[in-house]
Amino acid sequence: MSDLKIDIVPKALLVAVDFSVGSRRALEMALALCPQGEITALHVVDTEFAARVEAQGVAASSEVVGKLRSRAGEEFSWLLQEKSHRPFDTMIVEGIPFVEIIKIAKDLDVDMIAMGMHKATFRVDEILFGSTAEKVLRASHCPVLCVP
């Protein structure tokens, strides 16, 4: 087998961030892979989750979304301070995570998407429909880097 080496440096990279250990690793990897290009860290406030919380009578969907947006803003502030050696853009949007990740990746015309992967679970919805990472892998127009 040959020692084929291909150097592909993305010019624009989208990092899907849910603030888990895996997504933080994905951001680290993106910063290393794309030293000169545009990096956008995206957090999607899951409106389906907010609707489920409302359906259980815990809180209004709009209240949940507001709190999740606020928390994401705080988390991004920490990340930006922590990674101050390499600036990057941040976005917080509302919607279904995999749909928004794909849409924004196309809108920004990125060369690659990086995201963390959670360990396999036995949740019925993931068994039937797949995880967010799997859905992004299937629907993406560009390479997807999944980081455990």
Locate the predicted segments by residue:
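Small/aliphatic-rich secondary-structure junction motif
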Residues: 5-58
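Short, structured coil segments at secondary-structure junctions
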Residues: 34-35, 84, 132, 140-141
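General small-molecule cofactor/ligand-binding pocket signal
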Residues: 40-42, 89-93, 145
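Glycine-rich, Arg-bearing micro-motifs that act as flexible, cationic patches
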Residues: 112-138
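Structural beta-alpha unit
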Residues: 2-8, 80-113
